[in-house]
């Protein structure tokens, strides 16, 4: 998507700019697609659909008591507050009758208000009269020469606001920010001053930028040729989070100017923007901390700025703090000065050119451990009592930094690299340039309580955020429609780097599992292309989903495999060198690949079939003699005819790889490109079987003819290790997904996993457990307990030998240790063998030692879950959660607490986390997902979400990853039409923006698919079991 450009002549000041009434190709018509932008975390305002004429200052929130009663009644009756008509609202006061024979006399206040309304109405009518005519339909205006496009908005002071687009104009661009902040961590307020050097690219009177929640006290303007500061008028349009600085003189193209804005604001109580919180240290003393989380749209809440990724600039940051605190920002500290009042002012060096969402600063009590790496000082920060848990992160960061510098052939450009573990942080981590922020659990590692999965998590997250220093920071997408360029590349490099320098962690197993789950999401009708047009805040937030991260990275894996690792690296290095410190779009990446391939392959044409279409292909293979007949169509889980894609609407350019019997993987991998609906591959000889999509490096599902499926099933029975563990897991995944679609009998899927008694690798076993667990959950939640029990018994018989071989230790390779965790959790969850007895003995001994006895870290979660089944065990775990300092151990305890079958305990857990009591609100989505995984918690989780929806969307932005997880985690196991209707009715009664959320549509579709799966497979499952 191209950034918004304004190449129109600027009208004289205080007049409406013509450009705001013309639609840009990438701008949504707000008469049809309004942006519902959250103004503050605790005050979300919505305007009625199609209305852009909100006039503030007219007492729009001042309802009479009768009107408030009507509002309450309307909500009780299920009426949508946003869709009520003004006629209904006025009728609430229509029942007030005057005494008989008397005429009511309007008060002076009423007459003044009426006169003001009349003036505003006349102004609006004049504006509309002077604009091009439009006949509005349900869909809005479509013809540019007949449409007003966007109706002129009003500023908060009632004046016309000179800009109506969500995107900022490009008539003025920032060059440098000088930001000074003085936070008060006791009152949770701050004072700020920002001086912005800008350049005018076109003649204009107005400078439009972002600002939300600021009490602006003074704005001055100065041109580069004059040293005289002049007062400037400021207008605010809070609906878009924008302010307009009306300059005292025209800004001339090519000239530089300086704005200075002085303001004050509250430190946010949510997790977005410049936010603060308190925590209790190991001495039970209350401590205060402030940090930032600006991505994607929250820098504007910390300081007025041009808050779009393409508006890159440099930053000089000063922070005034109390002496006991440490202040950090993106760049190294330049100086510290003690002020007259005893406060300290830290000034940081001027930054490199970067986007606003990457700006960061932290104030709190911290300690650090550091190491120099070729002139860059790498430091890991944590609160003082947890500094002993940063050693692994430092060692890992040093190795990864050296690897990325060598691979990208570009040195990390800053003199320091800080990684900070923040006690209360909602995101997993954030890649702020030079100041990476993390949850404690994703950065700290305690060898006594952190499992192999914990170690792998810390390593992956550090790798991901370091990769962002090049992909996202050095080279940045122009707009959020191409977020996948940031997140897809960082995710790909995360796994790629681990395979190179931490090969023992077998991170490919995690990447494979992530691809399986992402493809399940991408097979829904509610999916979206990874490069999608976005405008509103909700749409931007929704781009932060598994498709941007894992589909994006999966496509890069497929491309690397097809082109070769050397060609791929050469293209990536060229891309980074060509676009350093710039803003780019997808075509710039593909152009680099085309340059490296010398146009022998049109990479851009090939990859656009993957980035601009939602979904992925189903490749159907039939072997006849020495030929493979191939066809492609979209893999689509929903079988309803009315939403089936047409056969001609989807076509991908698919790199097809395959291996046959007796062929060595490294020498005999064959690759072809299918860029048509069907094709034929000639084999050198007749073979018994063929496995397409080697190691699942391609982003597609493969369906074989009946005989070919049977040949593969037979091969797994006689010798599964002819195929790689990735391919065995791939076959399990594909056949169960096809069975759900009805392409393969469910019996055949279970026939394929009959070989599992001979399987000893993690990926195939965990994928089989995942697929059968989905079926178990559907059966259990619908009350088919006998069938569910028989299913578990059958799976247990297949894996009985492997389960009995497991020891309750932390011995073995990382992959073996993770397999042990999965197998023992399966056995104890379903009370199979002597698993629960052994776990309970370990728990009792641990509890008797008051939690001081060491437990094997890889089975700790399973032990805690078994122990939490008793009231005494649950209460003991709760006490330990509150008192211990290891985040790794706390997470294991929390999962056990949330796995209880006691609904009172579960409700208390969710409520406590929502309120931030005992459990931080950052844990809430994890708690809801865990509660929703079990019976009867899945019903309770949904009830809790319904009851507290308004509070949830106040704490977390609408469309955010947290809201996505909460909606999915509380509904994904519903499989009845009653629940479908209930979920749909609930969200229909929320705001229109809420119902349109992709995660809501996905939740409804998943419930429909669960119903569809049961209707299609229940009978055959009953017969087979």
From Swiss-Prot:
The modification Phosphotyrosine is found at residue 70. Binds 1 zinc ion per subunit. InterPro entries: Aminopeptidase_N-like_N, Aminopeptidase_N-like_N_sf, ERAP1-like_C_dom, M1_APN-typ, Peptidase_M1, Peptidase_M1_aminopeptidases, Peptidase_M1_dom, Peptidase_M4/M1_CTD_sf. The pregnancy serum form is derived from the membrane-bound form by proteolytic processing. N-glycosylated. A motif (Dileucine internalization motif) lies at residues 53-54, 76-77. The record marks 154-155 as: Cleavage. Residues 96-101 are annotated as: Tankyrase binding. Highly expressed in placenta, heart, kidney and small intestine. Detected at lower levels in neuronal cells in the brain, in skeletal muscle, spleen, liver, testes and colon. Residues 1-110 are cytoplasmic. PANTHER family: LEUCYL-CYSTINYL AMINOPEPTIDASE, PROTEASE M1 ZINC METALLOPROTEASE. This is Leucyl-cystinyl aminopeptidase. It comes from Homo sapiens (Human).
């Amino acid at each position: 998507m191209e950034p918004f450009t304004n190449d129109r002549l600027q009208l004289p000041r205080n007049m409406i700019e013509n450009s705001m009434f013309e639609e840009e190709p990438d701008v949504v018509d707000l008469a049809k697609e309004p942006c519902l932008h959250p103004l503050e975390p605790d005050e979300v305002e919505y305007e009625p659909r199609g209305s852009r004429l909100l006039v503030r200052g007219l007492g729009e929130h001042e309802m009479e008591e009768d009107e408030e009663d009507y509002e309450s009644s309307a909500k009780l009756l299920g009426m949508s507050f946003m869709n009520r008509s003004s006629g209904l609202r006025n009728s609430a006061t229509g029942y007030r009758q005057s005494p008989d024979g008397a005429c009511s006399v309007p008060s002076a206040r009423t007459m003044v208000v009426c006169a003001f309304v009349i003036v505003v109405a006349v102004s609006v009518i004049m504006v509309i009269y002077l604009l091009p005519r439009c006949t509005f339909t349900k869909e809005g205006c479509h013809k540019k020469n007949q449409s007003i496009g966007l109706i002129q908005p009003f500023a908060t002071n009632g004046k016309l606001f000179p800009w109506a687009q969500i995107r900022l104009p490009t008539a003025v661009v920032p060059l440098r920010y000088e930001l000074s902040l003085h936070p008060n961590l006791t009152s949770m307020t701050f004072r700020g001053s920002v001086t912005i050097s800008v350049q005018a690219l076109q003649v204009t009177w107005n400078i439009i930028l972002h600002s939300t929640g600021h009490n602006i006290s003074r704005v001055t303007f100065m041109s580069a040729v004059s040293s005289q500061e002049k007062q400037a008028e400021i207008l605010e349009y809070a609906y878009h989070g924008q302010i307009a600085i009306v300059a005292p003189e025209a800004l001339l193209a090519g000239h530089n100017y300086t704005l200075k804005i002085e303001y004050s604001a509250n430190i946010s109580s949510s997790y977005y923007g410049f936010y603060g919180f308190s925590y209790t240290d190991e001495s039970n003393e209350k401590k205060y901390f402030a940090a930032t989380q600006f991505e994607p749209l929250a820098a504007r809440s910390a300081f007025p700025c041009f808050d779009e990724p393409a508006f890159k600039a440099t930053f000089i940051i000063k922070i005034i703090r109390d002496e006991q605190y440490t202040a950090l920002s993106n760049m190294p500290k330049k100086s510290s000065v003690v002020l007259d009042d005893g406060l300290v002012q830290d000034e940081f060096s001027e930054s490199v050119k970067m986007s606003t969402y990457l700006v960061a600063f932290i104030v709190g009590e911290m300690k650090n451990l550091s190491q120099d790496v070729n002139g860059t000082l790498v430091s890991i920060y944590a609160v003082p009592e947890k500094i002993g848990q940063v050693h692994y992160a430092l060692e890992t960061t040093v190795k990864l930094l050296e690897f990325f510098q060598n691979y990208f052939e570009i040195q990390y450009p800053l003199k320091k690299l800080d990684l900070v573990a923040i006690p209360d942080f909602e995101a997993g981590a954030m890649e702020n340039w030079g100041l990476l922020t993390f949850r404690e659990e994703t950065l700290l590692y305690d060898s006594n309580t952190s499992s192999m999965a914990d170690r792998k998590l810390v390593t992956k997250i550090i790798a991901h955020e370091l990769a962002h220093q090049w992909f996202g920071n050095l080279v940045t997408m122009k707009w959020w429609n191409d977020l996948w360029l940031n997140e897809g590349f960082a995710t790909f490099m995360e796994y790629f780097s681990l395979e190179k320098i931490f090969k023992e962690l077998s991170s490919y197993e995690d990447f494979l599992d992530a691809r399986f789950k992402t493809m399940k999401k991408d097979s829904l009708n509610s999916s979206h292309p990874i490069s999608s047009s976005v405008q509103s805040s909700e749409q931007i937030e929704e781009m932060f989903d598994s498709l941007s991260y894992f589909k994006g990275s999966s496509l890069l894996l497929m491309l690397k495999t097809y082109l070769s690792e050397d060609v791929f690296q050469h293209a990536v290095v060229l891309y980074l060198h060509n676009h350093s410190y710039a803003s780019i779009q997808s075509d710039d990446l593909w152009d680099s690949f085309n340059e490296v391939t010398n146009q022998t392959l049109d990479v851009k044409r090939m990859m656009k079939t993957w980035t601009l279409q939602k979904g992925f292909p189903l490749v159907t293979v039939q072997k006849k003699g020495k030929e493979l007949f191939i066809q492609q169509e979209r893999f689509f889980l929903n079988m309803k005819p009315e939403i089936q894609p047409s056969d001609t609407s989807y076509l991908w350019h698919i790199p097809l790889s395959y291996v046959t019997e007796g062929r060595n993987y490294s020498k005999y991998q064959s690759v072809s490109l299918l860029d048509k609906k069907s094709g034929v591959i000639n084999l050198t000889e007749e073979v018994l079987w063929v496995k397409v999509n080697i190691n699942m490096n391609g982003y597609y599902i493969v369906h074989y003819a009946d005989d070919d499926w049977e040949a593969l099933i037979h091969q797994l029975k006689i010798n599964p290790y002819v195929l790689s563990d990735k391919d065995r897991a791939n076959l399990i995944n594909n056949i169960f997904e096809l069975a759900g679609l009805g392409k393969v009998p469910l019996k055949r899927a279970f026939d394929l996993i009959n070989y599992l008694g001979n399987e000893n690798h993690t990926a195939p076993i965990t994928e089989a457990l995942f697929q059968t667990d989905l079926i178990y959950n559907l059966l259990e939640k619908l009350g088919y307990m006998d069938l569910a029990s028989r299913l578990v018994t059958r799976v247990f018989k297949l894996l009985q030998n492997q389960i009995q071989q497991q020891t309750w230790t932390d011995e073995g390779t990382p992959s073996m240790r993770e397999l042990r965790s999965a197998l023992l959790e399966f056995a104890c969850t379903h009370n199979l063998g002597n698993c629960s007895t052994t776990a309970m003995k370990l728990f009792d001994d641990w509890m008797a030692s008051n939690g001081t006895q060491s437990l094997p870290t890889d089975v700790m979660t399973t032990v805690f879950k078994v122990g939490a089944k008793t009231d005494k065990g649950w209460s003991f775990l709760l006490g330990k959660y509150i008192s211990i300092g290891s985040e790794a151990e706390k997470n294991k305890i929390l999962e056990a607490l949330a796995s209880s079958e006691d609904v009172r305990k579960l409700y208390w857990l969710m409520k406590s986390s929502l309120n931030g009591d005992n459990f931080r609100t950052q844990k809430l989505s994890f708690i809801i997902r865990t509660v929703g995984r079990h019976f009867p918690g899945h019903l309770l989780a949904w009830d809790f979400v319904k009851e507290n929806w308004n509070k949830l969307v106040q704490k977390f932005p609408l469309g955010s990853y947290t809201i996505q997880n909460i909606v999915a985690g509380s509904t994904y196991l519903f499989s009845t039409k009653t629940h479908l209707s209930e979920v749909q009715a609930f969200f229909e009664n929320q705001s229109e923006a809420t119902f349109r959320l992709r995660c809501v549509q996905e939740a409804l579709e998943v419930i429909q698919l669960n119903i569809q799966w049961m209707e299609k497979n229940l009978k055959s499952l009953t017969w087979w079991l």
